[in-house]
């Protein structure tokens, strides 16, 4: 990782707003592949590496939009474990047993990481890779429990994104132990295989293992 020269400025903003981790939602059935391949890859990098995704969170239309805007090689992370697109993916049947992976803030400090003030493929999204782009994120809106708690004109900013180039390594995923996975210096070991189920709805949005992708794109609004 090529670390930013002004990393302290980014960390200061995160500390000011009480942000300690990032999140990525995926399906429980994808976890074995994530571990076996050493972390989270963008869907395009998965294709390049012939990595099969058992239950992809993104739709075909979202992939088309990603490619159109040059975002296909980025892993999407969010600031919330209750990402609206997780529920969309569930309703569409793409995922059925969602889990949330928690990701270390250090990925923000990589010079290749980009930031978007809303879903990166949505009309009007401000995307950049510097401190000014980072400051455009509506951090106060991220403090809401869900996007429904925000005014309609502010709800889009609840989906602010961290776009990590190509790959989030296993070492950056902080809650693997919650899934019975332990990391050693030389290998990732499957400690146990404990089935987990989850029932998530708008009424019970937290009834799952809090472990964070977001990696689903919304269609660009015209």
Where do the PLM segments sit?
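Phosphate/oxyanion-binding active-site loops and adjacent basic polyanion-contact surfaces
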Residues: 77, 222
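Acidic, polar low-complexity linker/tail segments
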Residues: 184, 188-210, 214-221
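Active-site-proximal loop/hinge segments that shape catalytic or ion-binding/gating pockets
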Residues: 1-76, 82-187, 191, 199-201
């Amino acid at each position: 990782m090529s670390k930013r020269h002004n990393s302290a400025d980014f960390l200061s903003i995160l500390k000011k707003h009480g942000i300690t981790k990032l999140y990525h939602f995926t399906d429980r059935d994808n976890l074995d592949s994530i571990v076996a391949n050493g972390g989270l890859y963008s869907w395009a990098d998965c294709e390049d590496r012939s990595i099969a995704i058992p239950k992809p969170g993104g739709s075909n239309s979202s992939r088309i939009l990603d490619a159109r805007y040059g975002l296909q090689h980025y892993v999407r992370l969010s600031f919330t474990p209750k990402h609206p697109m997780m529920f969309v993916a569930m309703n569409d049947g793409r995922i059925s047993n969602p889990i949330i992976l928690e990701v270390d803030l250090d990925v923000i400090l990589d010079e290749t990481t980009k930031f978007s003030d809303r879903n990166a493929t949505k009309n009007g999204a401000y995307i950049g890779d510097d401190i000014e782009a980072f400051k455009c994120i509506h951090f106060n809106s991220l403090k809401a429990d869900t996007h429904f708690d925000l005014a309609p004109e502010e709800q889009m900013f609840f989906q602010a994104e961290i776009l990590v180039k190509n790959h989030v390594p296993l070492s950056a995923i902080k809650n693997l132990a919650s899934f019975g996975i332990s990391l050693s210096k030389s290998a990732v070991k499957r400690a146990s295989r404990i089935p987990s189920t989850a029932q998530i709805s708008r009424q019970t949005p937290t009834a799952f293992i809090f472990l964070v992708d977001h990696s689903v794109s919304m269609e660009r609004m015209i």
